[in-house]
């Protein structure tokens, strides 16, 4: 049960959702955030230059609920660039993330926020997630039906930005890099909570099923990491070693003007545009 004093003093949680051509799914994603048992939230939705009706859907949601704030990028730059836009506008003591084609358990934010508030040794936490087919069936990968979900990462906003700055603005794999950078730079825990609280829809065209960064899944449900992700992960690991040894700063500014480590050309963002706010 949640103590009375916790209910009376709940910190503001900023939820950052990036959107690109997700008009068909973003309503349910937004509703799963707004319907959370944890009520003290702001939802920042960042449209990454969608060509469908996503922006109109977002504006309609914002008109119905003043907890929703709509931001726009003027040029498509990828989900982690858009997440950084959200981070730069966020006001919450805690900040977390949500994709535009997924849904959360209705108590996800309450579970994570309470765990983080009561765990002074942790700078963040995340939950497990279940990947589902478009028909709602569980998808098994590498022998498991659920996996650690970095998309659910919740951090102490000011402490995290002071320690490591922002996400690397590449198009894939920057969430795992961010978590490991937090651990390396701060020596504090980013805890995996042993609960499935997030459900990801496996749709065609997602980051994990399309493009250079796509995972290849065989008939037995075994997923193989693509070369560009392996190259990026190894380059990030070497950079983290330098951070640990005190040879490099862990802070990535936003926007990023000079890379501290290698990223394959295929996953780098295009030229960045201005930011517009509703």
Predicted segment positions?
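Nucleotide-sugar donor-binding/catalytic module of glycosyltransferases
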Residues: 1-277
């Amino acid at each position: 049960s949640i103590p009375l004093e916790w209910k009376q003093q709940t910190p503001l949680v900023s939820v950052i959702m990036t959107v690109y051509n997700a008009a068909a799914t973003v309503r349910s994603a937004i509703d799963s955030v707004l319907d959370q048992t944890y009520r003290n939230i702001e939802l920042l939705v960042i449209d990454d230059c969608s060509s469908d009706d996503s922006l109109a859907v977002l504006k309609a949601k914002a008109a119905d609920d003043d907890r929703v704030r709509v931001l726009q990028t003027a040029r498509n730059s990828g989900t982690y660039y858009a997440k950084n836009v959200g981070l730069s506008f966020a006001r919450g003591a805690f900040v977390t993330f949500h994709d535009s084609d997924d849904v959360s358990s209705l108590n996800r934010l309450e579970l994570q926020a309470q765990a983080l508030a009561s765990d002074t040794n942790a700078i963040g936490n995340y939950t497990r997630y279940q990947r589902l087919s478009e028909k709602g069936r569980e998808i098994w990968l590498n022998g498991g039906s659920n996996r650690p979900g970095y998309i659910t990462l919740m951090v102490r906003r000011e402490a995290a930005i002071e320690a490591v700055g922002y996400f690397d603005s590449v198009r894939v794999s920057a969430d795992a890099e961010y978590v490991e950078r937090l651990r390396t730079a701060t020596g504090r825990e980013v805890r995996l909570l042993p609960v499935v609280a997030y459900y990801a829809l496996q749709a065609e065209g997602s980051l994990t099923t399309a493009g250079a960064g796509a995972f290849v899944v065989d008939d037995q449900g075994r997923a193989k990491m693509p070369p560009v992700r392996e190259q990026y992960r190894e380059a990030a690991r070497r950079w983290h070693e330098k951070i640990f040894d005190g040879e490099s700063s862990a802070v990535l500014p936003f926007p990023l003007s000079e890379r501290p480590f290698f990223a394959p050309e295929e996953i780098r963002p295009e030229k960045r545009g201005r930011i517009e706010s509703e």
